[in-house]
């Protein structure tokens, strides 16, 4: 059915002028009228027409826009251009070069024109040159996001809504929209609107004067009078869960212009609304590939999406009720247990993973960067759910990458030099660690990686950058990500007869870069095995964790809370400095006496600081407290105990009471009163992984032996 586009334009005008929504007090709020006033005064550039609003007024017009988007974009733009003078209440203060250029031309033309001749002087200017705004459509909420491979020939020219992951982003460059030429003979100006990616510049002057005199004036391009717009090309690829069995993920080129540029980075999950169009080939390529045509998506709206759900990346604050739900008592245990609730046990491992998601605080004293991100290595026997924990963290983190050891080369992890198909230049393409910037990079089967590829990670784990010198490109890329690695011991299973170094077989330089190295052993234990088997069979039957008193938190809620925690920048107070120093010296002393311990260096102290600041962030506090340091020390101690296994308990004194006694004895000052504060002794023992009940039992036992006395107020332990 043929359409009268003039009446359609009038409909567009009516909608822009008359559409309103009632606010809370019942007052009419003209949504687009306010935006038109902002555009008229140059306070706003992009105007987004929400098709849900238009559907309330005229559903037929919405269908027409979705079918023939390019035409209606121009109709709406013309309607806005005609309406702008009504909304202009004052002169624009800051004029750009094009304003001055056009005003000057209008004045020159009025002087040289016959006063009796009635003619609109702006007619000769193309509408694209006069527009100072961009117009885009926002797809109706009823339209479902499509997969890249479902966008086919029947979608050409229509408004489509697709989801995918950005794999490549070009630099933003100026793109010519209107070319302005000046004649060297008559001085007349000629304008050439450009629609396609390439164009043939005009050479001969088409003005009446040159045609009459046959002077053959030549045209020269005036860049000051031409109009340019920002242009960027994205490559998006469909999600791995959208790819059919045995197929390779499909890609699509997206052309982004104006205000939509610089919104996405490689690795972002995005939803794009745009017009699906064929690419017009000209020149030599048309001769070579005359029958083939490329397609692309002209972007109208680009939003970042969550990784696993279809909703936009929520930046809204948590409500008070949601905060109360999270921060009730035992919230630390509750948050940790909400990580992979289907997996049984591993409470301390989950706590460490929670701290990895929150992260510590970055420090940059005088340009030297001390990282805040926490790196964790999970090592263990086969079948202890290491990979499941990794894949859950990959889904939970707002920004993450998942790779495996054998499937990743050093270049694939860091950066590769590629040839740009558009310009032919050599460009850098970021690998998994660059794509996971400000997020988490999960590397499974870490022990299976080639040594040459593993060395690529060393710089990232401490300096958080990737330095490149390839193909004439010398640069440094940011890779501020936490690394979560999972590895199997050297002999398939952990061999208790071998030392820790022989079992792990990773270089000390790499091990010291991991803040927490956790060994998860699969030891036979009847009660534990029974509970685990019941848990697994229930999960297998019902596809959810067994019912319990504890209700795990929703993944979306956790993601928003973690984002909120990351905004905090807690500092370590002066009062805790001595306590931390003493604790570190104690750890070094213990490492010296126990030959089988992991490598303890100054990085271990930094690890404690990172874990402490992450715990303070989790409580939404600005200052680190003693409890945070004790919990950080406890986690470090538990991870070391996991490495020592049975050997550790035999190498130490057998009973916990004896270890607690030696710990308290070491706290006694060499000179002065032979007494220790009760609270300090308890904190030191708890930080070493003992429970308060074990501490109390040891006190009573040695008090009966008359080794020490505890006063009635239980504030002081005095040695006899």
From Swiss-Prot:
SUPFAM superfamilies: Nucleic acid-binding proteins, P-loop containing nucleoside triphosphate hydrolases. Its EC number is 3.6.4.12. ATP 2 binds at residues 513, 603. One of its GO terms (cellular component) is CMG complex. A zinc finger (C4-type) spans 183-210. It is an enzyme of class 3 (hydrolase). The keyword Nucleotide-binding applies. GO terms for molecular function: ATP binding; ATP hydrolysis activity; single-stranded DNA binding; single-stranded DNA helicase activity; zinc ion binding. A motif (Arginine finger) lies at residues 512-515. It is found in: Nucleus; Chromosome. SMART domains: AAA, MCM. Early fractionation of eukaryotic MCM proteins yielded a variety of dimeric, trimeric and tetrameric complexes with unclear biological significance. Specifically a MCM467 subcomplex is shown to have in vitro helicase activity which is inhibited by the MCM2 subunit. The MCM2-7 hexamer is the proposed physiological active complex. Acts as a component of the mcm2-7 complex (mcm complex) which is the putative replicative helicase essential for 'once per cell cycle' DNA replication initiation and elongation in eukaryotic cells. The active ATPase sites in the mcm2-7 ring are formed through the interaction surfaces of two neighboring subunits such that a critical structure of a conserved arginine finger motif is provided in trans relative to the ATP-binding site of the Walker A box of the adjacent subunit. The six ATPase active sites, however, are likely to contribute differentially to the complex helicase activity. This is DNA replication licensing factor mcm7-A. It comes from Xenopus laevis. The gene is mcm7-a.
